[in-house]
A protein has these predicted regions:
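Hydrophobic targeting segments
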Residues: 1-5, 26, 34-37
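N-proximal low-complexity "stem/linker" segments adjacent to membrane-targeting elements
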Residues: 1-20
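Active-site-proximal specificity loops/subdomain of glycosyltransferases
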Residues: 8-9, 13, 37-79, 90
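Conserved catalytic core of nucleotide-sugar-dependent glycosyltransferases
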Residues: 71, 86-158
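Active-site acidic Asp-centered loop
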Residues: 81-83
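Amphipathic coiled-coil/heptad-repeat helices and related helical stalk/stem segments
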Residues: 19-22, 62-66, 156
Length: 158
């Protein structure tokens, strides 16, 4: 299974810590074989793993860019496009037992937070209009209507 995320350095150091914590947890997940990280600057990430594949770009990728990358580079594989602040657990194994052909799952998250930057709490995120990860098997159809980036208000529901 392939995880595809966008990574960038936020001006908020606590937020950067959250992104790195989530990345570290996902790299430790045995169900995730590869993590494809779309980034604008290769020097932004300060640790390495054989699972990490950096895709350096001059600009932020749109959803269409991410889905087309999966179609072209990860043919006939399960892909998980997710926000950088998402951690996956062993429930990903559920998708390995499904016929994922022409299926597309949009999932919301559980919220993680910290008050001191060291101790993290995890709780359900209560917002029915939120999706933070998209799981599918390539190929999937794409269109120009997907030309918007992650992290923009309302992007989850387009």
């Amino acid at each position: 299974m392939n995880l595809i995320i966008e990574y960038f350095n936020s001006r908020n150091h606590m937020r950067n810590g959250e992104y790195l914590y989530c990345l570290h947890q996902n790299l430790a997940n045995d169900l995730i074989d590869n993590v494809y990280i779309f980034m604008e600057d290769d020097a932004e990430l300060n640790f390495d793993s054989p699972k990490i594949h950096r895709i350096v770009r001059e600009n932020r990728p749109s959803y269409k860019d991410l889905f087309e990358y999966c179609n072209e580079e990860l043919q006939d594989q399960i892909c998980v496009v997710a926000n950088a602040d998402i951690i996956f657990d062993d429930t990903l194994r559920f998708f390995n037992s499904l016929d994922m052909t022409k299926q597309f799952y949009a999932l919301s998250r559980w919220e993680i937070s910290t008050k001191d930057g060291k101790n993290w709490e995890i709780e359900p995120y209560d917002n029915s209009a939120s999706q933070d990860s998209w799981i599918f098997k390539t190929p999937i159809a794409t269109s120009d209507s997907m030309n918007y980036t992650m992290g923009k208000p309302g992007c989850d529901n387009k």
